[in-house]
Design a protein with these regions (language model features):
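N-terminal beta1-alpha1 ligand-phosphate binding loop
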Residues: 2-36, 41-48
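Short, structured patches in soluble enzyme cores that scaffold and shape functional sites
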Residues: 12-14, 66, 132
Length: 161
């Protein structure tokens, strides 16, 4: 681990275009970013959209170590989204790419632009299941990840090969 680096988790999702390929490309773009090292991808999963219509999502989570400050990392995530044609038409709209900063080490961040830990991550199987692939012992404010997974077991999620 590099001194001054932080372990970061980012959720990735897409349900328009070649969704899985988009996620793989976005992960490679993140891995190639100065200040980001040791990027690991969870499995890919298929899930139905939350509170909207449209095609099923492909979701995963990435873990990496990072020396970028959180706001600079957020800028990079949003730039990658835009490179892939992300438009923010309305909440939960179908999207070519969605990158959400879930955890930035142990930091608690609450600014106009950024809330970390992500405020709804503990309610979403499409975040918790791939997150558990990478961090099966993770403890969140709402409880151990294994306990949180029990609360979302009614949400349909399918691992892709």
């Amino acid at each position: 681990v590099i001194p001054g680096s932080t372990t970061v988790f980012v959720a990735m999702g897409a349900n328009l275009g070649e969704a899985r390929q988009t996620l793989e490309t976005a992960a490679a773009e993140l891995a190639a970013t100065a200040g980001i090292q040791d990027l690991t991808l969870a499995h890919f999963y298929s899930t139905a959209p939350v509170d909207s219509s449209g095609p099923d999502y492909v979701n995963t989570v990435v873990r990496f170590t990072c020396t970028l400050p959180p706001e600079i990392l957020l800028d990079r995530l949003q730039a990658i989204e835009q490179e892939h044609g992300r438009t923010r038409l309305y909440r939960n709209a179908p999207r070519t790419l969605d990158l959400d900063l879930l955890l930035y080490g142990q930091e608690q961040i609450n600014t106009e632009r950024l809330i970390v830990p992500h405020p709804r991550m503990h309610e979403r199987a499409f975040v918790l299941v791939p997150l558990a692939d990478l961090a099966p012992e993770l403890e969140l404010a709402q409880g151990h990840i294994s306990e949180l997974l029990v609360n979302v077991q009614d949400q349909e999620i399918k691992q892709l090969s």
